[in-house]
Amino acid sequence: MKQYNYPIVKTLLDTDAYKFYMQQAVFYHYKNVDVVAEFICRGPNILGCYSHILLDQINMMSSLSLSHEEYLYMTTFPFFKKEYLHWLKKFRYNITQVKVDNYHGQLHIRISGLWKEVILWEVPILSLISEIFHRHCYPEITSNIAVQHLNKKLKEFFKKNRDVDLSRLKIVDFGTRRRFSYDVQYSIIKRLKDTFPFLIGSSNYHISRILKLLPVGTQAHEWFQAHQQISSNLRNSQTLALKTWLSQYNQHLSIALTDCITMDSFLRDFNLFFSKSYQGIRHDSGDPVKWGEKAIEHYERLGIDPTTKTLLFSDNLNFRKMISLYKKFNNRVNIIFGIGTKLTCDIPNVKPLNIVIKLVKCNGKPVAKLSDSPGKTFCLDRNFIKSLCKAFDLSLTV
C-alpha cells in the first residue's frame, strides 16, 4: 500500500467555506461548548486498512497554519471579524482530539474537544480518506483523465440544452469532502472556470483563493444539531440556531439549511421574520421538486415574492438532475446548484465513497439529524430521537 512522506492537505484553507463561517459564530457565541463527532461509512467499503496512513496524515496537519497571504485574503471579506481572524492565525490542529482505529476492518474515527476547534477536522479528514482510498484502488487515474471525462460531459450538456435559456443558471463546486484527490478537484474547477460560464464559485476556500472564485457556503447540520443541547428548550433549538446565525452575520451568508429536523418542522419555525431576513434556503435531502414547491408555497403564503429569494439545491446532483430542476424553477425563484461528488469524483469505473462525519454529542448529551431522506437520519441515542420527535410533533418513522 502506498505510503506518503508528504502532507496531502497542505493548507488550512483546503476546506469548505461553511466551516470557517460556523467556526466564527461558535467563537463568538459558544466558546466553551464541547462536542463529539464520529465517522460513518454509508457504503460497504472496508476502510480500516487505511487507518495508519490516515493517522500519519492527521499528524502532519499539526503543522498547518494560516499564512500571512491567506490571512490578508480572509480580511477582504466583510463578515470576518478581526478578533476571530487573529485567533485563527494562531490556530493549530490539536491531533490529540482525533482517535483513529482499525476495528475488524472497519475504520473508526472519534473527534472530541471544544467545538470551535473540532469544527475544522471534518472536511480534511474526509478528503484524506477519499484520496488515500482512491489512489490505492485506482493508481492509474490522473487529473487529465478526470478532465477529459468532464469535457465529454460538457459537450453533451451544451448539445442537449442548446435550445434552453441558461442565462439564469448558477452552479457552485461543493466537492471537497469526497473528491478523488486534491489535484482532480483543482483541475476540474479550473476547467469549469475556463469553459463553463455558469460556475460562480467553490466551497473550497483555498481553490477559491488561487482561482479567484467566490467562496460559497453558510452552515451545516452540526450548527442545528449542537443547538439541540445548547438551547434550554428542545422545541426552541432550531429557532435559537436561526436567531444566533442572524445575530452573527445579519444580511451576509443568509442561506438556511432545512433538513436537520425535516423540512416541515423547519418551515414551522421559519416564520415571517426569518423568511424575510434570510436570503433563502438549502435543499439537502428528500424529493427536490416537492421541496422546491413547498418552499415557494411557504414564501407566497407569507406574502413574500419568491423571485426575491434563493433556493440552493445540493443533494446528490449531476448535470441531468440540475437541468431538470432548472427548467422547473428558474422563472419562479432564484436558484443555485451545489454539485459535489459528481464533479470532483466523476470518473469512469470509479465508485466514490459515501462517507460522512457527524456530531453525536454536544456538552456530553446526544444530538440528532432527522433528515428528509431516511438513509441520512442519524443519532446514537434512540431515546433522544423520541424526545426530538415529540418536541417537534414528528412521526418516529422519520
Swiss-Prot record:
A Pfam match: NAPRTase_N
CDD domains to which the protein is assigned, alphabetical: PncB_like
> EC number(s)?
6.3.4.21
Which keywords belong to this entry?
Ligase, Phosphoprotein, Pyridine nucleotide biosynthesis
- PTM comment for this protein? Transiently phosphorylated on a His residue during the reaction cycle. Phosphorylation strongly increases the affinity for substrates and increases the rate of nicotinate D-ribonucleotide production. Dephosphorylation regenerates the low-affinity form of the enzyme, leading to product release.
Q: Does the keyword Protein transport apply?
A: no
GO biological process annotation, one example: NAD biosynthetic process via the salvage pathway
GO cellular component, as recorded: cytosol
What this protein catalyses is:
nicotinate + 5-phospho-alpha-D-ribose 1-diphosphate + ATP + H2O = nicotinate beta-D-ribonucleotide + ADP + phosphate + diphosphate
Its pathway is: Cofactor biosynthesis; NAD(+) biosynthesis; nicotinate D-ribonucleotide from nicotinate: step 1/1
Phosphohistidine PTM sites in chain numbering: 221
What the entry lists under SUPFAM superfamilies is as follows: Nicotinate/Quinolinate PRTase C-terminal domain-like, Nicotinate/Quinolinate PRTase N-terminal domain-like
Quote one Gene Ontology molecular function term: nicotinate phosphoribosyltransferase activity
Query: Known NCBIfam families for this protein?
Result: NAPRTase, PRK05321.1
Its function?
A: Catalyzes the synthesis of beta-nicotinate D-ribonucleotide from nicotinate and 5-phospho-D-ribose 1-phosphate at the expense of ATP.
Q: Which family does it belong to?
A: Belongs to the NAPRTase family.
**Protein name as catalogued:** Nicotinate phosphoribosyltransferase
- The UniProt gene name for this protein comes to pncB
